[in-house]
Amino acid sequence: MPHIQESRVWCRSISQLSHLAEQFVTENGTESTDMKLLLQQCVDTLSNYQDECKKIKSVSKPVPSKELYDLYETAYVYFKIVSLIVLNKIPKLEEYARAKSDAVDRTGKQLLEIYNMLVNRLVKDDRIAEIKRFVKENSRRDPEAKNEQIGVESGKSIPATLLRNLLMGPSASGTVLLVDVRPRLDFMRCHIKSSSIICIEPVSFKESYTDIDLGKKSMITSPDAEIALFQDRDKFDYIVVYTQDSEKNKHNVQQQQLLVDLLINRSFEKALDRTKVFILAGGFSEWSNAHPDFCVSSQGDSVYLNGDTSGLSLQLMPQTTPQKQYNNMFQTMLSGPTDVHGIIRNPHNFPTQQKSKLKRVPSFRDYFRSSSSSSNINERPGSVPPQLSNGSTIYPETPKLMTNDEYMKSLPQLSPITARAITSPSRALSAVGVSKSSASNSISSLLANSGSASPMKPPDTPLPFTDSIKTLGQQNLTVAVSNLNFSVGLVNCGNSCYMSCIIQCLLGTQELCTMFLNNSYQNHINLNSRLGSKGLLARYFSQLIHQMYQYGKDIRKKMGNEKTAVIPTQFKIACGSINSSFKDNTQQDCQEFCQFLLDGLHEDLNQCGNNPPLKELSEEAEKMREMMPMRLASAIEWERYLTTDFSVIVDLFQGQYASQLQCKVCQRTSTTYQPFSVLSVPVPSTRTCTLTDCFTEFTKIETLEQEEQWSCPSCKKRQPSTKKITITRLPRNLIIHLKRFDNMLNKNNVFVSYPSVLDLTAFWANDYDKKVTNNNVELPSRGQVPPFNYQLYGIACHDGTLRAGHYTAYVNKGAVLGWCYYDDTNWRQIRSAREYITQNAYVLFYHRIHST
């Protein structure tokens, strides 16, 4: 009997359309590694998607027809293309990684703002869910699909009895993937018995996540078997999500609904067009009561009990699609008959508008122009402070500040920064001998060649702190060091312990604390600093310190709790307005926050922040520098650095190290000098180690792997090479970050023994032989005179994993209070003399001391 073709026209399925989008991404020019070009393509494609949505909305009678199907299909494909490029491709680019790590790169910062805008558009788009629903309802269903036997709409709840039938009923209704949305510890103790079950902790994801984020972030420490199950999620007939459904676990219930919505509407990597997603009614509580024989505890997961995931084999998520060469055009792919997954569809063309190349819109360039003004906090939409669970305690809150205009009027009259008395380069540089005769007359020419077109230079002496606090400002400086022994806790504003521990440690820095308490920091604000926030971050930080001082100075007890704690709402909002990483309630790395805060304060107080960037060294100047002793070359580089970065933060916290590459064939070297505020040192993978061992590991000669070998300018090719890091400048206050997490977020919980008094003299570059020859000049020492002994005054501690851990702090508050322990709202004096020496140490704070 001849086959009778159906008269009805069907939509292509979600999986078919997703395949088209993936094919376009891999075959049509998106193999570029230029982040700006890819962002331009995304903006253009998103504009096309919006045009299709407008056409869909303009249809007065949405009667199923080929033309209507074309609109919905094209809209979905456009959206999918943007999501694949933005969420899959761009995060893998080296340029993206550099932009995220380099806060000084203005272009990178602008690209990240555009990228974040695109992510925000994707996540908050309220039309794609309806488009997917329409496509699913009007695409041909697989007659053998088992999930059609259950007449429950995806996203709804099913009772425990139905789930049991699905898992073990005689009808074998289909395959089920269970998703347990509870803390890993609860999951280990007891969960539903099934070989296809995974645990996604409720704290591991947020509203802006997609299915890609779940795989790459939320499940980064999950067992291999669970990661494999999640990767095959689209092969299951049903996904059933459950949590501990009770009044005490409202947050988990909210996260459960969030996860279901994510799987249904934001599954960009694996389209769940044939998989239904359900919620287990009553949660695990009802299941365990009804089917106690169908519950089981996990064995062999003790690695999660103490947060030590160093033994786990964490996986890199595979790319959605392989990289291919360009061979097709977009309109060819969409308009022609397509054989997708073995299903041949009758040809029908997409709207003619799509037959041309993706159109460009002028808005992309506008994003660059408008992004530079986005750093002003008062120009951003307001945020609602996070709700706190304890309603019985009223915490003192940092007050809201005046508007920006009011603040500018209230500032003391500042003389123009460019009018500051500046010494000429020739006077700023005085003789330090060069040990190699070939470089004996090179310093002047080197400075000339290296030059900054800067109209100003920093003074020869650093900003004074130790001799007289009065030089910091013209205010009434009544806060004496003896009065800095205040202590108060900070309320956790939703996983903000990473912020609290750093604030407590930084307040142990007496010079910094004094400067903000007496308001002398205002005399250093540079309103024209290119990367600053016009003093807004500094103001919020000062307000918080004042509030903590006010509520902490009168405490006569040896401890404090939530009744005396301060809630840092306004400061947290300010930080989130400047850096979106700190905007929501997700856990962050405390050392990254420390770096952000110090960088932000530096830029606000940067006296040279509006100077033009430094010019790169010429090849001749670089060769001259390589011939100099590292002691001299680093001093020259530091003086160059100060022409664009000069602030009290630099004087208090910043140091410098040299990273030197050397060709093992011809012995040529290339040295770069890098300033730092937080010095990250590796932790050896041994049973125990000392802090000195960490510095030894940090400064040892490293033989580079073949793919990392240096392209030697003399040999004109990649050669076997080594890398050596040398500390060339040690700051007044040294912040040391113990690198306990590797690139896969495995944590090294090795106990690092750190001393109360640390001697780093042996690690400081001291290759200058003090031979003075003609035409040599001497650079200001700026405190770089050995020995370098440091006194410990703060420890930020981390317990658990990077995604699900907790931060606390130990701080030496001076002679009156001594060492104190801080855990959010609670604080107390230490209970034993060596309590602050702990295995959980993560960031160490040292202050330089001088022998009397």
From Swiss-Prot:
User: Mind listing the GO biological process terms from this record?
Assistant: protein deubiquitination; proteolysis
Lineage: superkingdom: Eukaryota
Q: Which residues form the USP domain?
A: 488-849
Q: Entry's Gene3D superfamilies?
A: Cysteine proteinases, Rhodanese-like domain
* Keyword set includes Cytoplasm: yes
Topologically, how does it sit relative to the membrane? Peripheral membrane protein
GO cellular-component term (any)? cellular bud neck
* Stated regulation of activity: RFU1 is an inhibitor of deubiquitination activity.
Q: Does the keyword Membrane apply?
A: yes
Which residues are responsible for catalysis? 497 (nucleophile), 806 (proton acceptor)
E.C. no: 3.4.19.12
Cited Pfam families: Rhodanese, UCH
Q: Where is this region: Disordered?
A: 369-393
Q: Which residues form the Rhodanese domain?
A: 172-296
Give the keywords, sorted. Cytoplasm, Endosome, Hydrolase, Membrane, Protease, Thiol protease, Ubl conjugation pathway
Q: Give me the reactions it catalyses.
A: Thiol-dependent hydrolysis of ester, thioester, amide, peptide and isopeptide bonds formed by the C-terminal Gly of ubiquitin (a 76-residue protein attached to proteins as an intracellular targeting signal)
Example GO molecular function term? cysteine-type deubiquitinase activity
Give the UniProt subcellular location, in the record's own words: Cytoplasm; Late endosome membrane
- Give the family this protein belongs to, as stated in its UniProt record: Belongs to the peptidase C19 family.
Function field:
Ubiquitin thioesterase that acts at the late endosome/prevacuolar compartment to recover ubiquitin from ubiquitinated membrane proteins en route to the vacuole. Also removes ubiquitin from soluble proteins targeted to proteasomes. Is essential to maintain a normal level of free ubiquitin. Required for promoting coordination of DNA replication and avoids DNA overreplication.
The name this protein goes by in its record: Ubiquitin carboxyl-terminal hydrolase 4
This chain's source organism reads Eremothecium gossypii (strain ATCC 10895 / CBS 109.51 / FGSC 9923 / NRRL Y-1056) (Yeast)
